[in-house]
Design a protein with these regions (language model features):
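Active/ligand-binding-proximal structured segments within catalytic/core domains
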Residues: 60, 73-89
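An aromatic/glycine/proline-enriched structural segment found at the starts
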Residues: 2-68
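A generic structural signal for well-ordered coil/turn residues at beta-strand boundaries
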Residues: 42-43, 53-56, 81-83, 119-121, ...
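Charge-rich, well-structured scaffold segments of protease-associated domains
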Residues: 1-31, 72-73, 86, 93, ...
């Protein structure tokens, strides 16, 4: 069990109250979970569902496979690199997003996320559009250009600072701190590692992650319309 308490309080008093309410049980020892081996290949590249929606919703995904030995520090560094890449590819300040928005292909800034645990990991780009296939096509083209030509130094530095700022802002909210610490703890991560590891994320490392994960054979498109 994990408990996170954030706010203006005296730690000693909170700990005393928690201890009063804990039920004493014998130590059952460490629980070792055995998970099935995940396939590296995607299940299906395209899926379409029919629902009553005013505008088609889409999700473009990239499958990432965790190594046999999950390393929290490596996961943190990779997470930062992917956040930078997603913002460079189709974030609000990217050329691709501006073009898609001006042409009315995408309605608003897409959701960008990288979800990972001990067993699985994937990248998600989500939003609403009357032409999700065109968005997927343009993402492929942008990724291909980045892979072939490398990342623009100035663009990379600007987005890198933006991502760091996003992390720092999280600490302005007590609720965000609690959510962040709880989620990271379940992955074996110290939330402060993000601030420390940010300094080690170089343009070269981000380009390696781009080539390793953003592959067309790992890409899927799901549409609800």
């Amino acid at each position: 069990m994990t408990m996170v308490v954030c706010g203006d309080f005296e730690p000693e008093k909170i700990l005393d109250e928690i201890k009063k309410r804990l039920i004493k049980k014998e130590n059952q020892g460490e629980i070792k979970r055995i998970y099935p081996q995940k396939e590296k290949e995607i299940n299906m590249p395209y899926k379409e569902s029919k629902m009553e929606v005013s505008m088609p919703a889409f999700m473009v995904g990239y499958k990432d496979v965790q190594g046999e030995e999950y390393n929290p520090r490596i996961a943190v560094k990779k997470h930062i690199a992917i956040e930078i890449l997603l913002n460079m590819i189709i974030g609000k300040s990217s050329n691709l997003y501006k073009e898609l928005y001006e042409k009315g292909i995408i309605l608003s800034e897409p959701g960008l996320d990288y979800e990972f645990t001990y067993q699985y990991a994937h990248i998600l780009i989500s939003g609403q559009s009357n032409n999700p296939q065109e968005i997927q096509k343009r993402i492929k083209e942008t990724v291909k250009t980045f892979r072939e030509n490398g990342l623009n130094e100035q663009h990379f530095d600007r987005i890198r600072k933006k991502v760091y700022g996003d992390y720092a802002i999280e600490y302005n909210s007590v609720g965000n701190i609690a959510r962040m610490f709880l989620a990271d703890n379940m992955k074996g991560i110290n939330s402060f590692d993000y601030i420390d590891d940010y300094k080690t994320v170089t343009k070269q490392y981000v380009e390696e992650i781009l080539k390793d994960i953003f592959k067309e054979e790992n890409m899927v498109l799901s549409i609800v319309k």
